[in-house]
């Protein structure tokens, strides 16, 4: 289960992307979550996925 709080979600997702996954798609497939759900929640706190850096910035 992923954190529901956007700030905690940001930390959780960026850690997972840095340490375990080569892309947001891989992370979402593995954790069985919708990519749009994550991007929408993090966009609400002004963070967007940067494919080149493989993190939300």
PLM ranges: what are they?
Residues 32-57:
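Short, charge-rich amphipathic interface segments used for partner binding and complex assembly
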Residues 1-23:
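N-terminal acidic leader/helix
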Residues 27-28:
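Short alpha-helical "recognition helix" segments of helix-turn-helix
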């Amino acid at each position: 289960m992923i954190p529901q709080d956007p700030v905690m979600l940001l930390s959780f997702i960026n850690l997972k992307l840095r340490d375990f996954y080569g892309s947001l798609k891989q992370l979402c497939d593995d954790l069985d979550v919708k990519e749009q759900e994550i991007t929408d929640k993090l966009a609400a706190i002004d963070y967007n996925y940067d494919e080149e850096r493989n993190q939300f910035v």
